[in-house]
Amino acid sequence: MTVGQRIKAIRKERKLTQVQLAEKANLSRSYLADIERDRYNPSLSTLEAVAGALGIQVSAIVGEETLIKEEQAEYNSKEEKDIAKRMEEIRKDLEKSDGLSFSGEPMSQEAVESLMEAMEHIVRQTQRINKKYTPKKYRNDDQE
């Protein structure tokens, strides 16, 4: 079953129309219809909005294995090492700073771990975006 088919099945199970689900997820009805017909592959943020509107986890729409495979396939071993090295640098910088606090209150270990998870997400996003960018001097301009 495709992502679009799962969304449609869950929407019908919840007795929602496309209009109702689109409003709850802040999407246009036509875009939702295109997703359900598998004309578009929705982004993670769109999937999160739809899942939230349906009251389910994103993994219920795409399946846990799909999320893990996509995340693992995105980076090779060198890139994973680079990310791990950068995260260690960030952790050391945070530990060096005197009185790590948020809004004047010292951060708990749980808050620091949460911050590190967010920072890892940022590093991975930046790595992925930079991977897509090709400097102009290296581009193949066949149109000229």
From Swiss-Prot:
Residues 7-61 form the HTH cro/C1-type domain. Keywords: DNA-binding, Early protein, Repressor, Transcription, Transcription regulation. Gene3D superfamilies: lambda repressor-like DNA-binding domains. CDD domains: HTH_XRE. Pfam families: HTH_3. Transmembrane segments: none annotated. SUPFAM superfamilies: lambda repressor-like DNA-binding domains (SSF47413). The keyword NAD does not apply. PROSITE patterns: HTH_CROC1. InterPro entries: Bact_TransReg_Diox, Cro/C1-type_HTH, Lambda_DNA-bd_dom_sf. Residues 18-37 bind DNA. GO terms for molecular function: DNA binding; DNA-binding transcription factor activity. It comes from the Viruses. PANTHER family: HTH-TYPE TRANSCRIPTIONAL REGULATOR (PTHR46797), METHYLPHOSPHONATE SYNTHASE (PTHR46797:SF1). This is Immunity repressor protein. The lineage of its organism: Viruses, Duplodnaviria, Heunggongvirae, Uroviricota, Caudoviricetes.
